[in-house]
């Protein structure tokens, strides 16, 4: 079977490395390639995928919303989030999914016991935030809060959860057990601080969905304060694992997938 990831730029993607480690571990002769698709060529996406006989593909920046009109069907999670990161090509039809939210939550469950009782704050109100919130909503509905700088970003949110602005979140930071940053702060050299951690409780787990850099500014600051931290590596691995399940109905070797990514990030490959 043939798989791929589409985006622009895409040469930096670790998805091919991660998926090939999984294929090798499972003795599968599958392939996975990175396909650069500039925005001005996206109208040819059906032709590009068809000519390569792709059975399923991941979608990354900047095409997660752009892909939707080209789909024949879309699952409820992706529809709710308004973004697609996984496409199954089956019997000539394209079916869209979003595995980012479940990928993050599956990883979080493995390192945090008692998540059902945790008071959780999500920073940011973009697509990633909505995907994670949708999954956490199933587990911790009454204790889930999302904060954003501008409240208007919540206008298209249907989830009945606590929605506050960042200044309100800052003044009540000590009430939360887990804080999840989904904003671009700390990514690609961005050193802006998304929120002040002055009122952070000592037990609070501080998380970021970014995995490269391995530690974003908010994680570095939290670690310096003595707090446990959790980056986006597991989210990346688990969203890929969920994609693999959708494409093949097989269980992936998550350990092999994670180990190869860690080796690459450490410069060991």
UniProtKB/Swiss-Prot annotation:
Pathway(s): Metabolic intermediate biosynthesis; chorismate biosynthesis; chorismate from D-erythrose 4-phosphate and phosphoenolpyruvate: step 4/7
Keyword NADP belongs to the record: yes
Entry's Gene Ontology molecular function annotations: NADP binding; shikimate 3-dehydrogenase (NADP+) activity
Gene3D superfamilies noted in UniProt: Leucine Dehydrogenase, chain A, domain 1, NAD(P)-binding Rossmann-like Domain
Site entry: Plays a major role in the catalytic process and a minor role in the substrate binding: 211
Keyword Oxidoreductase attached: yes
UniProt EC number: 1.1.1.25
Source domain of life: Bacteria
Catalytic activity field: shikimate + NADP(+) = 3-dehydroshikimate + NADPH + H(+)
Catalytic residues of the enzyme: 64 (proton acceptor)
Entry GO terms, CC: cytosol
Pfam family, one: Shikimate_dh_N
GO biological process, one term: shikimate metabolic process
Keywords noted in UniProt: Amino-acid biosynthesis, Aromatic amino acid biosynthesis, NADP, Oxidoreductase
UniProt cross-references to CDD domains, sorted A to Z: NAD_bind_Shikimate_DH
Record family assignment: Belongs to the shikimate dehydrogenase family.
Chain's role: Involved in the biosynthesis of the chorismate, which leads to the biosynthesis of aromatic amino acids. Catalyzes the reversible NADPH linked reduction of 3-dehydroshikimate (DHSA) to yield shikimate (SA). It can also use NAD to oxidize shikimate.
Protein name: Shikimate dehydrogenase (NADP(+))
Organism: Staphylococcus epidermidis (strain ATCC 35984 / DSM 28319 / BCRC 17069 / CCUG 31568 / BM 3577 / RP62A)
Gene: aroE
């Amino acid at each position: 079977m043939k798989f791929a990831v589409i985006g622009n730029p895409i040469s930096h993607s670790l998805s091919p490395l991660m998926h090939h480690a999984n294929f090798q571990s499972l003795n599968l002769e599958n392939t996975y390639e990175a396909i650069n698709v500039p925005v001005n060529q996206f109208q040819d996406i059906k032709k590009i995928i068809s000519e390569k006989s792709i059975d399923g593909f991941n979608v990354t920046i900047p095409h997660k919303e752009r892909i939707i009109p080209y789909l024949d069907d879309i699952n409820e999670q992706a529809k709710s989030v308004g973004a697609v990161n996984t496409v199954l090509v089956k019997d000539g039809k394209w079916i869209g999914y979003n595995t980012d939210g479940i990928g993050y939550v599956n990883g979080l469950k493995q390192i945090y016991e008692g998540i059902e009782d945790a008071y959780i704050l999500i920073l940011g109100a973009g697509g990633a935030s909505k995907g994670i919130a949708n999954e956490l909503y199933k587990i911790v509905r009454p204790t889930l809060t999302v904060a954003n700088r501008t409240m208007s970003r919540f206008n298209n949110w249907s989830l009945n959860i606590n929605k506050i602005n960042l200044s309100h979140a800052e003044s009540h930071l000590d009430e939360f057990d887990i804080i999840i940053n989904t904003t671009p702060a700390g990514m690609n050299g961005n050193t802006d601080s998304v929120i002040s951690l002055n009122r952070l409780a000592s037990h609070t787990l501080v998380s970021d969905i970014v995995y490269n850099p391995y530690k974003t500014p908010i994680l570095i600051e939290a670690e310096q304060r003595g707090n446990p931290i959790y980056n986006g590596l597991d989210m990346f691995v688990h969203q890929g694992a969920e994609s693999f399940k959708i494409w093949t109905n097989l269980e992936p070797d998550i350990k092999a997938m994670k180990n190869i990514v860690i080796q690459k990030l450490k410069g060991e490959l």
